[in-house]
Amino acid sequence: MKKIINFALYDFANSAFTTIVITFIFSTYFAKEIAPNPVLGQSYWGWTIGITGIVVAIIGPLLGSFADKKNYTEFFIKIFTIICISLTCLLWFSKPSEKYLLYTLLIVGLANIFYELSLIFYNSILKKISETKNLGKSSGFSFALGYLGGIIVLIICITIFIDNDTLPFGLSKENSENVRATSIVVALWYLIFAIPFLFNLKEINNNK
């Protein structure tokens, strides 16, 4: 059960990235404040995410095959997670100006690629920690915890950073500091709640 919980906590952790960056707060910020206009912003964002999906579809199977042969699953999960978190931090520098359009799309695109690649190897571990008859329950538990994590971090970001007149840490709404700070929240959330899984990954992967 401990392995299942640690596994699910990773879902709880990484849901912050898709919820805040890809789907809600940062995508809206990009469309309204960085792109020339919201319509173009949504289009650019959608194309970027679509392209990352194609990239992952191409290189994912190749990396998967390599990982199986060289036993690199553990390494890939850790390194891709760290890269995604690091890139997410860089979104703090995405100021509300068209000058940061390409920068933001590049960072988001790369972060999403490494996020999706980490999931390929993460999902492959489930069969090692759960009996075949319980795969559905284990997967469902992980999905539910991930969904819960996304809701919680969204509420935190909205109440503390977006719809709050008294911002923490000396932040101001000038230059959208409050919105950009949510990228740091995501990175910290992702890192902190992924630690139990990452630190026990060798044991989990070896199914000891």
Regions found by a protein language model. Name each.
Residues 2-202, 207:
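Membrane-embedded alpha-helical bundles of multi-pass transporters/translocases
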